Design a protein with these regions (language model features):
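N-terminal membrane-anchoring alpha-helices
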Residues: 1-32
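Alpha-helical protein-protein interaction elements
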Residues: 2, 16, 22-23, 152, ...
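Soluble catalytic domains of membrane acyltransferases
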Residues: 26-234, 238-239, 245-247
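Eukaryotic basic, amphipathic alpha-helical target segments in cytosolic regions
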Residues: 42, 168, 243, 263, ...
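Structured cytosolic regulatory/catalytic domains appended to multi-pass membrane proteins
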Residues: 130-131, 138-141, 256, 260, ...
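Pol beta-like nucleotidyltransferase catalytic core
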Residues: 231-234, 250-267, 273
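C-terminal helix/juxtamembrane-tail motif
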Residues: 271-285
């Protein structure tokens, strides 16, 4: 344990400096079995040439972001086969790297911490073909993870557009249909006391997992395992972004509007994959 502790200190900055993904672990058969449990799959709508860098906005957060995790840092749902030549990763909560051994699993999969420093490192590092997924709604959006609902926290999230402009990284919307369906969660409408309490916890700790219920190993109604319900990660067409070293607020806002429109179009075009009624639409807050 002493040697492990010393190694952790020496390697402390690894999650914010590109991590250290191991191909054999990312491609291990266990991830295919994991994907088959739900099942999970990726749908490609356009090519992502490896001569560009990409910031992939993943929606919705859900309870655990299972679709984004499986697509971006494992081979389980087929992302590497559909987009050859890309080096994919995902920005995840810094706390994922605070716990012994769990930290090493995250690093081995190539996950990086969600911070300005880590995103800048990835985009400034020489070479192209990086596909960096960010679950843009974060902990706030996780509180809206209810089956059959499609509520996103995105209106005020514009930093990703600024970085896309600054480094000339194309934006790609990705919607994980079914992400909100794998757990049942308690009602917590905006403005309710339950929601206010959850937001109070989130403001103190940075996270507040939704109060949820899944299934057990030997039953289908009570437990912490996710329900076996399909998740389909639809990867949209890239929005070409030209590099602007010092983008203006107007440029950021215009790119944000273009991204939101592309995301809504992606949802409307592919919602039939999960039999979502025609009168159900994406709500962006």
């Amino acid at each position: 344990m002493v040697l492990y502790f010393l190694w952790t200190i020496y390697d402390f900055d690894r999650p914010r400096r590109g991590s250290r993904g191991w191909s054999w672990y990312k491609n291990h058969p266990i991830w295919k079995h994991f994907a088959d449990y739900f099942p999970l799959r990726v749908v490609k709508t356009a090519d992502l040439p490896p001569d560009r860098n990409y910031i992939i906005g993943s929606h919705p957060h859900g309870v655990l972001s299972i679709g984004a995790f499986t697509a971006m840092i494992t081979s389980g749902s087929g992302f590497p086969d559909l987009f050859p030549g890309l080096k994919s990763t995902i920005l995840t909560l810094n706390g994922q790297f605070w716990f012994p051994f769990r930290r090493d699993i995250g690093i081995a999969l190539g996950g990086v911490e969600s911070s300005r420093e880590s995103l800048q490192y990835l985009l400034e590092n020489p070479g192209k073909g990086r596909a960096i997924a960010i679950v843009l709604g974060g902990a706030t959006e996780a509180l809206d993870a209810h089956p059959g609902r499609h509520n996103l926290t995105l209106s005020s999230r514009r930093g990703f557009c600024r970085y896309a402009l600054k480094y000339g990284a194309d934006l790609v919307p990705m919607y994980n249909f079914g992400e909100n369906d794998v757990y049942e969660t308690i009602p917590n409408p905006r403005g309710s006391r339950t929601r206010e309490f959850q937001e109070w916890i989130r403001n103190i700790w940075g996270i507040c997992p939704p109060l949820m219920m899944g299934r057990g190993i030997f039953n289908y109604s009570i437990g912490i395992l996710p329900h076996r319900r399909p998740i389909t990660s639809v990867v949209g067409a890239p929005i070409r972004v030209n590099r602007v070293e010092n983008p203006t607020q107007q440029q950021i806002d215009e790119l944000h509007n273009e991204y939101c429109k592309a995301l809504v179009d992606l949802f409307e075009t592919h919602k039939n994959l999960h039999d979502i009624p025609k009168d159900v639409h994406l709500n962006i807050y």
